[in-house]
C-alpha cells in the first residue's frame, strides 16, 4: 500500500469531535494536558466553552467526566492509552462502568507504534484491561475513515466506550462508497477458503498485504477487519473459521487478553479450529522509530507473512 494516503487515526478523532460538536451542544470534551498530541484540542479551538483541560490528572478527569455524564451530557475523555487504561482504571471501572454512563474514552498513542516514546508509553495491555469491564464497548479503528465513523457511532451508543487511536500515519483503505461502520460487526475485506486472517487497528492493512502475497503462492486467505473487540462479532468469525479451518489473529497488542484471546474463546465455544495468535509477546517494548520497532517485534508484513506460512505448514 505504498501509494495509498496515510493518516494517523488520532487526526480523525479530532476531526470527528469537531463535526459532532456542530450538531450536538450536549457534547463535552475533556483532556489531561495532552490536547495537542491527542488532537482533542481541535474541539477546544472550535468550542472552548465545551472543552476542559483537566491537567495531568487522568483519574480526576474520568471522575469529572462521570459526574458531568450523570447530568445527561455525553463526554469524551481523552489522553494517551497508557494513562487512561492504566492510571485511571479504577475510576473507569467504578465511576463510569458501574453506573453505565455515557463517557467515551478516546485513548491515543496506543501500542508499539508510539515508537520513540518507549516502553513506558507503549501501551500493549489496554484492550485486555478494558475488555474486563462489564458493559464496556472496545474499539480499535483500522484507518482514518473508520476512526471518524467509530467516534460518531460511539456518540450514538448508549453506554461507556473505549476507543484506541494511533500516532503513526496508516494507510487509508476504507474508501469504498458502500463502507458502513456498525458497532460489533466485523467486515470481510477479502474472501478466502484456506485460512482466515483476523486483524484490528493498523494490522488490518498488514493482513491485506499478507493475503496478497499468500495468493501469489496459491494460498487463498480470507481477511476480516474486527474493529470492535467487544462486543465481538462471534458469528462472523465462527462462520469463517468453519469455512477455512484455520485462523490467524493479528494485533498491535499483547497476545494475552486482546483480540487473539477473544477470538480463541469464541472459537473454543463455537468452532474449534487451529489458531495462531500474532501480537506482542509477554514483554515490554522499547524506544525507536515506529516502523523499526514494529518490525523487531514481528508486526511488519514480512514477519507476519513468515509466521502465517509457518503456521500453515
Language-model features and meaning:
Residues 1-164, 169, 180, ...:
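Thiamine diphosphate
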Amino acid at each position: 500500500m505504498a501509494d495509498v494516503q496515510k493518516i494517523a487515526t488520532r487526526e480523525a478523532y479530532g476531526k470527528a469531535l469537531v463535526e459532532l460538536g456542530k450538531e450536538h451542544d450536549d457534547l463535552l470534551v475533556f483532556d489531561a494536558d495532552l490536547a495537542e498530541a491527542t488532537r482533542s484540542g481541535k474541539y477546544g479551538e472550535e468550542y472552548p466553552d465545551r472543552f476542559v483541560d483537566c491537567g495531568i490528572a487522568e483519574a480526576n478527569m474520568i471522575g469529572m467526566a462521570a459526574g458531568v455524564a450523570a447530568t445527561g451530557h455525553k463526554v469524551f475523555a481523552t489522553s494517551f492509552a497508557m494513562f487512561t487504561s492504566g492510571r485511571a482504571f479504577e475510576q473507569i471501572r467504578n465511576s463510569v462502568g458501574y453506573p453505565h454512563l455515557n463517557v467515551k474514552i478516546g485513548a491515543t498513542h496506543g501500542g508499539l507504534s508510539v515508537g520513540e516514546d518507549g516502553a513506558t508509553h507503549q501501551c500493549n495491555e489496554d484492550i485486555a484491561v478494558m475488555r474486563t469491564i462489564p458493559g464496556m464497548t472496545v474499539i480499535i479503528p483500522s484507518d482514518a475513515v473508520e476512526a471518524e465513523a467509530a467516534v460518531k457511532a460511539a456518540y450514538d451508543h448508549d453506554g461507556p466506550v473505549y476507543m484506541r487511536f494511533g500516532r503513526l500515519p496508516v494507510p487509508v483503505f476504507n474508501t469504498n462508497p458502500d463502507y458502513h461502520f456498525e458497532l460489533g460487526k466485523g467486515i470481510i475485506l477479502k474472501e478466502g477458503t484456506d485460512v482466515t486472517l483476523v486483524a484490528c487497528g493498523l494490522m488490518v492493512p498488514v493482513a491485506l498485504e499478507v493475503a496478497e502475497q499468500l495468493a501469489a503462492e496459491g494460498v487463498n486467505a480470507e481477511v476480516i477487519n474486527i474493529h470492535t473487540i467487544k462486543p465481538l462479532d462471534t458469528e462472523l468469525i465462527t462462520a469463517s473459521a468453519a469455512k477455512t479451518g484455520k485462523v490467524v489473529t493479528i494485533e498491535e497488542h499483547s497476545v494475552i487478553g486482546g483480540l487473539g484471546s477473544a477470538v480463541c474463546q469464541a472459537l473454543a465455544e463455537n468452532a474449534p479450529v487451529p489458531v495462531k495468535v500474532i501480537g506482542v509477546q509477554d514483554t515490554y517494548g522499547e524506544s525507536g522509530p515506529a516502523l523499526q520497532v514494529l518490525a523487531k517485534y514481528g508486526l511488519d508484513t514480512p514477519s507476519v507473512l513468515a509466521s502465517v506460512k509457518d503456521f500453515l505448514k
